[in-house]
Amino acid sequence: MKAAELLEKLKGYLGAERRAQIAKYDSIKRVLKKLKKKENALKDKLKKEHDEKARKRLQKEMDVLSAQRKKGVNVLKELKEAKKK
């Protein structure tokens, strides 16, 4: 096979849809890492905080971050399953 034929074959394997899926997967993975860091920082703040109002606010913020991470993890799992197919 010539190089041009090999390149055409490669393009067929990595179609635009597949590249977009990979980019989305990587992007979500980066966002999840940032959310995890933010959640850990909030946990530390919550441990140090003594004011009840501030603790409730921090806890709400942590709950929101946790929900966002769970949604992101679920989307990541779906993309991973689609990647296998």
PLM features: residue spans?
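Charge-rich, solvent-exposed alpha-helical interaction surfaces
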Residues: 6-9, 27, 61
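Secondary-structure edge/capping motif, primarily at the C-terminal ends of alpha-helices
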Residues: 14-21, 42-50, 79, 83
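Short, charged, amphipathic alpha-helical segments
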Residues: 29-30, 55-64
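Short E/K-rich amphipathic alpha-helical oligomerization segments
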Residues: 33-56
